[in-house]
Regions:
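Non-globular, low-confidence helical/coil segments that flank catalytic cores
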Residues: 1-202
């Protein structure tokens, strides 16, 4: 993104290498690249609201050290994901990054039905450990976008996650089968188009 697009600001979660179990300060390369391209790096804080286009982006949670408390080392970093809600003209878009079930449950406990969203970006590329039933019950998404590569080594999206999304009644859009997907919100109607398929109403 930074190499190919003009990015004014980069929003990142607080990073605690010791709490996360990581031995290296992995964000340093990213920060150096941001500086090289003149991109401002902003450390997110829960509850902060940023103006974005005609709407606002709210940081719901991300990076709290207590979310690192897990036996799965890979989940340490995943649970540091920023969870954000974009709102504009009756449209709501929820993104939870790679957050695992523990971080999702914290969201549910803190915000409940205020997490309702028109469009939800499936957690962790459609992993079985994200997009839990508890979260979907409060989000009640009209449509879900899954970002994952074709025939990826991780098996994303997982069949269990797909079943939960289907049971939630959401239209499912996948980059592995559809390529780049563009969502449009107009006249209170969400539509989706991809490089490989015709426009489809969600």
């Amino acid at each position: 993104m930074l190499r190919n697009f003009a990015v004014g600001q980069l929003l990142v979660p607080p990073w605690d290498a010791q709490a996360s179990g990581e031995t290296a300060d992995w964000p340093r390369g990213l920060f150096d690249l941001a500086a090289e391209h003149g991109t401002d790096v902003i450390t997110a804080e829960d509850g902060t609201v940023y103006p974005l286009g005609s709407g606002t982006l709210t940081v719901l949670q991300g990076g709290e050290s207590e979310l690192y408390d897990t036996d799965d080392s890979s989940a340490h970093v995943n649970n540091a994901s920023l969870c954000t809600l974009f709102e504009a003209s009756n449209f709501r878009y929820l993104s939870t990054g790679d957050a695992e079930s523990a971080a999702e449950q914290r969201l549910v406990d803190r915000y409940g039905k205020a997490l309702h969203a028109t469009l939800f970006k499936a957690g962790h590329h459609g992993s079985s450990t994200s997009s839990t039933e508890a979260l979907l019950q409060v989000v009640q998404p009209q449509a879900v976008a899954i970002s994952c590569g074709l025939n990826n080594d991780y098996g994303h999206p997982h069949a269990r996650a797909l079943q939960r999304l289907t049971d939630a009644g959401a239209e499912i859009y996948r980059t592995d089968t559809m390529g780049t997907i563009t969502f449009t919100w107009q006249n209170d109607t969400l539509s989706a188009a991809s490089a490989d398929t015709l426009d489809a109403a969600a």
